[in-house]
Design a protein with these regions (language model features):
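Short, surface-exposed loop/turn motifs at beta-strand boundaries within globular domains
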Residues: 26-30, 35-39, 47, 83, ...
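Catalytic-domain carbohydrate-binding cleft regions of carbohydrate-active enzymes
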Residues: 114-559
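Hydrophobic or amphipathic alpha-helical targeting/insertion segments
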Residues: 94-118
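Generic recognition of long tandem-repeat/solenoid scaffolds
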Residues: 31-37, 54, 86-93, 106-109, ...
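A low-complexity, Ser/Thr/Gly/Pro-enriched, surface-exposed linker/loop concept
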Residues: 26, 30, 45-88, 126-129
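Bacterial Sec-dependent N-terminal signal peptides
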Residues: 1-25
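Broad, structure-driven detector of short, well-ordered beta-strand segments within folded domains
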Residues: 42-46, 95-100, 191
Length: 559
């Protein structure tokens, strides 16, 4: 073996060429830098002067990340790069980003150097995990917040909290809970954790962290908007602008679980017109397809009590009102849509509602095309004005292992929380492709970050009719809207009225309903709905009764 003698001069030369500190540990890219730190690939990407993306992955991990939420691509941004001790510092006109090349920690400051947020040292963790044949990681990212710093967001939660400090929240979409891994700080920044698997958010005195059940990388966006409006602007710049709904959708909506016939639905509109009380929308809930569970969600009128649905819609329109109907993502095994999806292996396998039904694989473009085809030919072409996409979580009543089945987009566990935005977005895009005569209107029970670009109006699910639940809707709606999605509402009066067995005959329930109506007047969609008892205004008393007069007054405020 040949050796070389290394002199002191040679050693000095080697030391000098290594002087650029960590200059060889990172490289510049078109929108930021790349580095290898702590056995991780780390990328810092400027999407704008105010928006920065951080991607970390174990070295050697081969993956392609498709975001269901983010539609923005990096814009040309002026920024500087300098080395400082063990760190590299990137600075735009809005923010300063410091990456520690020893620990992988990323810290954020404004352009003046005022600290905004910092990751924990070694706060990014990947734990290998296998779900059936799919090998992936449990992914964790931890941050350090100021002790008295308030944060908001995380979607529509029912725990009654506005400030999400000192909370542990399981972010998995279910009925009445919409989970968005996004927080906004009173310091004028926000963080969007771009992961769709069930995730646990934890905040305690030691850390603020996102722990996701599946992912190939830690992927999040830091946005600095200086104030709440500025941060929401950044989120919409990143995930899409809000669509303006048609004017009529901002009027009053009447619904119940359910109108049992074509005649009953039309009579409701007629009575509102006779009373001179404003009404813009009427909603047909489930079982217009029939009452046998095998015919569940046939996406067509099959109930003999709705003998002429096209004429029904025409009659609604003649009374200067609009109609939408309930469509679910699950289908009974006797329906044509079930048979077509099943023949092409486009159904997912887990217990849902009802148990005899199966949910379609919304991530598969062929399944989405079939879904819309039935909606279009059986409903939209007959005059339907919009869509009530119910249970878009979708409802999952099975063991945890069923999350490990494959979808078109990969492991279901990896993409679970993205189901609503894909399903809702597909209906929006399909209708736009078919016709520009009507603005798309969608009411839906679940959501994910970015859903505002489809103009969808989310509601808070099947909540109970109590004063405490009404109180909890205020922080639920505010924290949801803070995530960049403005269209939100609740079932006025609460969905489940079994707390009041006598329903509208009980003065106590009527008072709750009236107060809930006053709240609902100032939400983006004013919609009366529920089970157990009807809620039409003319059933609350005669004109002159305080309940009737108050309800009429607040309905008129919408106009």
């Amino acid at each position: 073996m040949r050796t070389k003698k290394v002199t002191g001069l040679t050693m000095l030369f080697l030391a000098l060429i290594a002087t650029p500190l960590w200059g060889q540990s990172y490289q510049k890219t078109s929108c930021g830098i790349k580095a290898n730190v702590c056995s991780m690939n780390v990328e810092v990407q400027f999407y704008s002067p105010e928006i920065v993306r951080i991607i970390k992955s174990p070295i050697g991990t081969d993956f392609v990340k498709k975001s269901f939420s983010v539609i923005k691509t990096p814009e040309e941004t002026d920024y500087s790069v300098r080395e400082q001790n063990d760190c590299v510092v990137l600075k735009s006109k809005a923010v300063e980003i410091t990456l520690n090349l020893k620990t992988g920690k990323v810290a954020y400051a404004d352009a003046k150097g005022n600290s905004l947020l910092t990751e924990k040292d070694y706060g990014t963790q990947f734990t290998p995990v296998a779900y059936r044949e799919c090998e992936t990681y449990l992914v964790r990212q931890a941050f350090m917040l100021d002790r008295d710093e308030a944060i908001y967001g995380l979607g529509q939660l029912q725990q009654g909290k506005m400030n999400q400090r000192n909370q542990m929240v399981h972010l998995r979409n279910v009925n009445s809970t919409i989970c968005i891994p996004y927080i906004q700080s009173i310091k004028g920044y926000s963080v969007f954790w771009d992961n769709y698997s069930p995730t646990t958010f934890t905040d305690n005195p030691m850390e603020t962290a996102f722990d996701s059940q599946a992912g190939d990388c830690a992927d999040y966006y830091f946005m600095y908007g200086e104030n709440a409006d500025g941060v929401v602007r950044c989120m919409r710049d990143l995930t899409g602008q809000v669509q303006m709904n048609a004017l009529w959708t901002y009027g009053f909506w009447q619904s119940r679980e359910r109108y049992q016939s074509q005649e009953e639905l039309l009579d409701v509109v007629k009575k509102y017109r006779e009373l001179g009380v404003p009404l813009d929308g009427i909603i047909q809930d489930w079982q217009y397809w029939g009452t046998d569970q095998k015919d569940w969600n046939a996406v067509e009128f099959g109930n003999p009590l709705f003998p002429n649905p096209q004429k029904m819609m025409e009659d609604v329109h003649k009374m200067n009102a609009h109609i939408i109907a309930s469509v679910w993502p699950s289908f009974g095994n006797n329906t044509n849509i079930y048979k077509e999806l099943n023949s092409k292996n486009l159904l997912l396998d887990f217990k849902t509602f009802p148990e005899s039904a199966k949910v379609y694989d919304t991530f598969n473009p062929e399944a989405r095309n079939i879904y819309w085809d039935y909606m279009n030919k059986n409903l939209f072409a007959k005059g339907m004005d919009g869509w009530w996409l119910d249970a878009t979580e979708p409802e999952f009543f099975d063991n945890d292992d069923k999350l490990n089945q494959k979808t078109y987009a990969g492991l279901y566990r990896k993409v679970f929380n993205a189901f609503p935005i894909v399903s809702v977005g597909s209906v929006y895009d399909h209708q736009r492709a078919v016709s520009s005569d009507k603005r798309v209107f969608i009411l839906t029970r679940s959501a994910f970050a970015g859903q505002q670009r489809y103009g969808a109006n989310s509601w808070s699910g099947d909540i109970r009719s109590t004063w405490d639940v009404l109180r909890k809707q205020i922080p639920a709606g505010l924290n949801f809207s803070i995530c960049g999605i403005p269209y939100w509402n609740t079932d006025i009066g609460g969905f489940h009225a079994y707390t009041y067995p006598d329903g509208i005959k009980d003065p106590a329930y009527r008072e709750l309903y009236v107060r809930w109506t006053q709240f609902g007047t100032f939400t983006p969609m004013m919609r009366s709905h529920g089970t157990s008892t009807p809620r039409e205004i003319y059933l609350m008393g005669e004109k002159g009764a305080w309940e009737f007069n108050t309800l009429e007054k607040y309905k008129n405020l919408r106009y």
